[in-house]
């Protein structure tokens, strides 16, 4: 589904992501990483802290959760014309001595509130697997170590970063806001 240039919002807010998993804090980690990748695109985005503060005020004044408030009303409060919603749909962290898996799956969607239209919906996942069949006592120790290394916190950070990169690569950039690089006319060196 192609998105026309007129449909792409210019000022976008990334709302808190829903967590449909048992992993505490994963939605916030994915949202921050997603925002870091999204902020390099030529959209005008609202800082997450400002979005969060205004959402708290909006939820208090309406008595509803952010997911129950119409997108247009959210954008009026935030001063934007587009919203990005997100949901963590799966998270796995498995360690079984000879095998380990670390995985996350998320869904994001962009809404243009001026047109009252969902522009895109993306779902992607990243999984890291490690393991082997040990054939000697030494290889059993090495397999256990390598599978344990796969579920460290740094691996989780890499996995989340990779997921958010993949999602952001699929989001179109508005042409009118693409930053022009300066033309290099001359280079002087010593």
Feature-to-residue mapping (PLM):
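C-terminal/domain-edge helix-coil "capping" segments
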Residues: 1-8, 74-77, 113-190
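N-terminal leader/capping segments at the start of a protein or of a new domain
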Residues: 1-21
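Extracytoplasmic/secreted cell-surface and envelope-processing proteins
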Residues: 23, 93-97
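A generic structural micro-feature
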Residues: 78, 98-103
């Amino acid at each position: 589904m192609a998105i026309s240039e007129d449909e792409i919002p210019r000022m976008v807010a990334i709302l808190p992501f829903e967590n449909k998993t048992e992993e505490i804090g994963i939605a916030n980690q994915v949202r921050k990483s997603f925002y870091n990748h999204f902020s390099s695109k030529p959209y005008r985005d609202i800082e997450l802290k400002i979005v969060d503060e205004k959402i708290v005020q909006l939820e208090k004044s309406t008595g509803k959760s952010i997911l129950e408030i119409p997108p247009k009303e959210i954008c009026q409060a935030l001063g934007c014309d587009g919203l990005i919603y997100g949901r963590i749909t799966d998270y796995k962290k498995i360690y079984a001595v000879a095998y380990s898996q670390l995985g996350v799956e998320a869904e994001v969607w962009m809404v243009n509130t001026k047109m009252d239209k969902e522009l895109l919906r993306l779902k992607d996942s990243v999984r890291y697997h490690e393991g082997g069949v040990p054939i000697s006592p030494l290889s059993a120790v090495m397999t256990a170590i390598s599978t344990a290394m796969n579920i460290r916190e740094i691996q989780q950070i890499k996995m989340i970063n990779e997921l958010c990169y993949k999602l952001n690569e699929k989001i179109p950039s508005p042409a009118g806001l693409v930053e022009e690089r300066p033309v290099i006319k001359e280079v002087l060196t010593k």
